């Protein structure tokens, strides 16, 4: 999930609709085609690793902005229903602790 979020942040910050992320990230050749498109449009010479790094930088900047705006990690939590309401047909809940969530962005 965190790699998907980073890749989606990179795609979104490059001016592409974030919904293309799902199609692009499922196929290596499509991902390469998008990278080629962005390189051609912006005059970049980015590799796939550069795009990954861009996504990480964007997410880091977003989190820094939120911290400066006064948001704390206690406010960066999923709604209670994620861990309380069972999802059918498997009757399971989201079983990730707050401590694990706090580590998601520690690259």
Residue spans for each PLM region:
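Extended C-terminal regions of large enzymes
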Residues: 1-107
């Amino acid at each position: 999930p965190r790699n998907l979020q980073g890749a989606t942040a990179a795609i979104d910050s490059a001016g592409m609709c974030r919904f293309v992320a799902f199609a692009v990230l499922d196929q290596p050749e499509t991902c390469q085609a998008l990278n080629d498109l962005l390189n051609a449009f912006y005059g970049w010479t980015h590799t796939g690793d550069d795009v990954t790094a861009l996504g990480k930088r964007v997410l880091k900047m977003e989190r820094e902005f939120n911290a400066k705006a006064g948001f704390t990690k206690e406010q960066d939590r999923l709604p209670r229903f994620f861990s309380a309401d069972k999802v059918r047909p498997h009757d399971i809940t989201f079983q990730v602790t707050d401590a694990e969530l706090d580590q998601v962005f520690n690259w």
